[in-house]
């Protein structure tokens, strides 16, 4: 009886310590939701990188969506976050992250911070993340949220991501999270030799192809991955494409 009581108390203390380590606003309910998301939406669809799966288990996605949509945070769908932007569905976040083949030593540039969720996931599998958001309200909100959650290896700034972040270049990997009909030349120039770039490429107002671009010297190679639907990249990208 004494041993059983000791074991019971130990389990309670362990659970309390585990909950205490969770970010503010997280709970066992959301931990279970993330585990279900990983098992049912990611692993079954061939996401295999263990570090990516761990990141998806750990980052509290529900804190990055509007309060009215928290109940949908772990569903297999994109969600609106305001300013005409969305947070990508979990599978796409995991797929794009996995395509970069990060090992933990890389410096990554993200174009389109949005809610900050993708940057948070990247921060778990890369050394440093630099993220740019053109929508000032989203930029400010995401920056404050990422800081409050303790993501110290993320640098965020407001601006037009089309031109990249030349001061911090080159980057081992670049991710564009909005649709564009061409790969911005400044981003190709800021990609390190041997680096990888992933983006939704095609008509910004229709369906696109998720593509992977690799660089070897001045040789850039492109692989088509799958069909996707992203919101348009705004700013100079639309001007350059002739859209208004």
UniProtKB/Swiss-Prot annotation:
Family matches, as InterPro entries: PCMT, SAM-dependent_MTases_sf
Coiled coil: none
UniProt key word Cytoplasm: yes
Active site: 88
Broad class of the protein's primary localization: cytoplasm
EC numbers: 2.1.1.77
The keyword Methyltransferase is assigned to this record: yes
Function: Catalyzes the methyl esterification of L-isoaspartyl residues in peptides and proteins that result from spontaneous decomposition of normal L-aspartyl and L-asparaginyl residues. It plays a role in the repair and/or degradation of damaged proteins.
UniProt record similarity statement: Belongs to the methyltransferase superfamily. L-isoaspartyl/D-aspartyl protein methyltransferase family.
Annotated protein name in UniProt: Protein-L-isoaspartate O-methyltransferase 2
Species annotation: Shewanella sediminis (strain HAW-EB3)
Gene this protein is translated from: pcm2
């Amino acid at each position: 009886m004494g041993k059983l009581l000791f074991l019971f108390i130990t389990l309670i203390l362990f659970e309390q310590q585990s909950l205490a380590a969770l970010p503010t606003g997280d709970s066992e309910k959301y931990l279970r939701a993330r585990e279900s998301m990983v098992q049912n939406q990611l692993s079954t669809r061939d996401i295999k990188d263990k570090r990516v799966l761990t990141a998806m288990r750990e980052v509290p996605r529900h804190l990055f969506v509007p309060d009215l949509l928290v109940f949908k945070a772990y569903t297999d769908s994109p969600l609106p976050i305001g300013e005409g932007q969305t947070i990508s569905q979990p599978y796409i976040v995991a797929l794009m992250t996995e395509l970069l083949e990060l090992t933990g030593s890389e410096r990554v540039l993200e174009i389109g911070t949005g809610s900050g969720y993708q940057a948070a996931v990247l921060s778990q599998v890369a050394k440093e993340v630099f993220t740019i958001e053109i929508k000032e309200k989203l930029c400010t909100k995401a920056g404050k949220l990422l800081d409050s959650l303790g993501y110290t290896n993320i640098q965020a700034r407001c601006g037009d991501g089309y031109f990249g972040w030349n001061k911090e270049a080159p980057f081992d990997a670049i991710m564009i999270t909005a649709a564009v009909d061409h790969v911005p030349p400044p981003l190709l120039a800021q990609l390190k030799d041997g680096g990888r770039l992933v983006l939704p490429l095609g008509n910004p107002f229709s369906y696109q192809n998720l593509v992977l671009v690799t660089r070897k010297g001045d040789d850039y190679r492109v692989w088509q991955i799958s069909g996707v639907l992203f919101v348009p990249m705004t700013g100079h990208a639309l001007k350059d494409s002739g859209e208004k």
